[in-house]
Amino acid sequence: MILPPISSTPGLRPGSENPPRHAVGVLTPDASPGKTSTAAKSPSSDLPGPGLSFDPPSADLFAADPIQRAATLADVATLIADCQKCKLCEGRTNTVPGEGSATARLVVIGEGPGRTEDETGRPFVGRAGELLTKILEAIQLPRAQVFICNIVKCRPPENRLPQYDEIAACLPFLYRQIELVKPKVILALGGTAAQSLLSTKQSLGSLRNQIHRFRGIPVVVTYHPAALLRNPHWKRPTWDDVRIAARLLDD
């Protein structure tokens, strides 16, 4: 799988107590044989307009793959725990497959585990995680009713951006998790999550305020909670994005 080069758009590193600045990566799967288009359809005229639509290859094409044979989220987590497809396995304390409801209406996707997540094996448990929990509760969604995960399932060294091969190794796990949960809406947190999920080079700013599609599922893009810790003025636009997701859930 070929992944395009990293962009230079400034961003913030998730998963850190005092997140340093970094470049938001253009970390996307090759669009072939999947397909990205701009033909998504807005479900309601009072919601933002359509954005990208990405449809990775059908799972039927990979039926012999152990990941596709995983029948439950626990099965996927077991495969992740045994994964050695990239060098991230060499420095991890724990894999972080994700957690939450197996029948969640909302799937939340971040970039990758930070130090606390690596230590605990759970996603979004540091300061950024506390903020995410509050955001979800503000739209009457207890954390336990949501499925929360990341693009990569192991912590990159020094909380650096995930590299191309690392994302490519982890995307099949994410795809299978989404297939099993069958959410009504996906919330992508930060540029890496949005670009990787939608297979696009577009910046985070250009992806906001649109309703994208991943295999037909509406995708809303917003800032990563770690970015909000350093840039409180982004909280208002983030809240606007989250309310779009809430309206889609209620639609």
Name every feature range the model reports, one short phrase each.
Residues 1-251:
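A polyanion-binding, active-site-adjacent surface
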